[in-house]
């Protein structure tokens, strides 16, 4: 299948992402997707599921990140499950997220998603893996990571977090080595630690 229409859809998210170009929106229909991971989204692409209750993405390698995002990416309306420490559902690439096209940085945007796992992390923002403001933007993300971490920001990375709800996490929101998180309209239920900060930036 060439992935250009619903009747000719790619069978995997990774397959669809492999042909995506800047400006592409990939529609993910309801179902459970076990994917070869990590899947790296090109800059300025969007991955949009039918609904977070009906689209579930699971990694074939549970200790590796599920998605790596670049400048201007968006992921919406899906549940991530099965990733375990040290993996995150969403992170910057292992190389670096460059400022494609120049100008101001447009952080990856994660909206209306759920991370449902054990020791894994929902979002890991490592400032050493991106440029400019080294940031991601989050709206409506539930983190049900039992014994894991909701959002981790390190190495002078930056997170704008709105409506992030953590349940049973060992650490809900954590910042290290100069990382910064702006947090609004969010809460931490159960779990061990709510807000954790340590270390200093360069």
Where are these regions (language model features)?
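Short glycine/acidic-rich loop motifs that flank beta-strands on beta-rich extracellular proteins
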Residues: 36-38, 52, 58-64, 83-94, ...
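All-beta strand scaffolds that present successive hydrophobic residues in beta-strands
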Residues: 28, 46-49, 73-77, 100, ...
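Nucleic-acid-interacting cores, centered on viral/eukaryotic replication and modification enzymes
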Residues: 149-151, 157, 164
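Extracellular beta-strand-rich solenoid/capping regions of secreted or surface-exposed proteins
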Residues: 14, 21, 34-48, 55-104, ...
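Short, surface-exposed connector motifs at secondary-structure boundaries
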Residues: 20-24, 143-144, 165-166
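Non-transmembrane elongated oligomeric "stalk/shaft" segments that connect baseplates/barrels to distal
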Residues: 10, 15-16, 104-105, 123, ...
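Acidic Gly/Asp/Thr-rich repetitive segments characteristic of extracellular carbohydrate-active
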Residues: 1-29, 34
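Beta-propeller domains
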Residues: 160, 168-169
